[in-house]
Design a protein with these regions (language model features):
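Short beta-strand elements in bilobed, periplasmic/extracellular small-molecule ligand-binding domains
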Residues: 3-16, 72, 102, 121-136
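Periplasmic-binding protein-like
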Residues: 32-42, 61-63, 99-105, 148-167, ...
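Glycine-rich, charge-decorated loop segments at or immediately adjacent to ligand/cofactor-binding or catalytic sites
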Residues: 71-76, 138-142, 195-208
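Segments of small-molecule ligand-sensing domains
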Residues: 238-245, 249, 256-308
Length: 309
């Protein structure tokens, strides 16, 4: 209301993941007065809502699901599809002096490997096996960095300890090369967003190693826009917001104003960034759903800044 001047009534319904409960909700008078439906969260609950929404031309926003089995022109999907996860890796692999190297550990994330290999189709790459036990450390990784090329290193290890060792070894190799008067290596590391579950990683290495991660959502607590939102949220609810809270805010800021215009067509191809995560909605080839195409590429810089695109 304060930003756009709209006064909106919000009705909340809990489906409890029960089909009978969902049918009751769809028949509810307050539900049928809605001009915008956000949810349900789970894809299997969408068909009951979509049937009503199509009949009365009410937009439906799916905030979290990567929808596979529901197709409708009234449906907007906020979560980017898995198939688009590494769309932004292409420009990292381009260049006359580019060298792409997959770094394997003793235990590797095979799903991540499959995703990367699919994204690298047609791109030449080399493989490097990192083994801490053979004391390869800096020496083995120094040879990767000192090749005079623009290196893209993709770390496939699925061990928190091993990932930390690899990142530390690369940072050490870079420091040693520069200290010996060598040309500063040019390199970027692509990591796995699932590393966030590792509690032992030295996050300072992310910056030293110019790490790039791909994520469905990004909200950095010390960013000014996030700090402002967090402060307002705490005042209102007495607790820190979760990622679901951020997504809910994004949904409101994108779709409530759109509700007052031609939502089906005015939004297509436009870029929306309510907080730090950006959304661009397009209909997928052969489908009717309006799907956010934008995975966030989070880049850690040596000057200890983070860029998001």
């Amino acid at each position: 209301k304060t930003q756009y001047g709209y006064s909106v009534r919000v009705d909340l319904f809990n489906t409890r993941q029960e089909s009978d409960r969902l049918r009751t909700i769809v028949d509810d008078a307050d539900f049928r007065a809605a001009r915008l439906i956000v949810g349900p969260v789970y894809e299997e609950e969408l068909p009951a809502v979509i049937g009503y929404a199509e009949e009365y031309a009410v937009p439906v926003v799916s905030p979290l699901a990567d929808v596979k089995n529901v197709d409708s022109d009234v449906l907007f999907q906020m979560a980017p599809p898995q198939m688009r996860k590494y769309a932004k890796i292409e420009e990292l692999t381009q260049g006359e002096h580019k060298q792409v190297i997959l770094i394997y550990g003793e235990k590797n994330d095979r799903e991540f490997e499959r995703e990367i290999l699919a994204a690298l189709q047609g791109v030449p790459y080399a493989r490097h096996n990192y083994r801490y036990a053979v004391k390869e450390g800096d020496q083995g990784l120094s040879s990767l960095l000192a090749n005079g090329k623009d290196n893209l290193l993709i770390v496939l290890s699925d061990s928190g300890l091993e990932v930390d060792r690899i990142l530390a070894a690369i940072a050490s190799a870079n420091t040693n090369l520069v200290a010996r008067g060598k040309t500063p290596p040019r390199f970027t590391i692509v990591g796995n967003s699932r590393w966030n579950r590792f509690g032992n990683l030295d996050r300072a290495l992310y910056f030293k190693d110019r790490l790039v991660l791909f994520s469905t959502y990004h909200a950095k607590r010390d960013a000014e826009v996030i700090k402002t939102f967090d402060s307002d949220y705490i005042k209102a609810f007495g607790a820190l917001p979760s990622l679901y809270s951020y997504r809910g805010y994004d949904a409101a800021m994108i779709f409530v104003p759109a509700m007052y215009s031609d939502i089906q067509y005015d939004m297509e191809g436009r870029r929306y960034t309510p907080l730090q995560t950006s959304y661009t909605f397009q209909q997928m080839p052969g489908g009717s759903n309006h799907v956010n195409q934008n995975w966030m590429r989070v880049s850690y810089r040596p000057d200890f800044t983070i860029t998001v695109d």
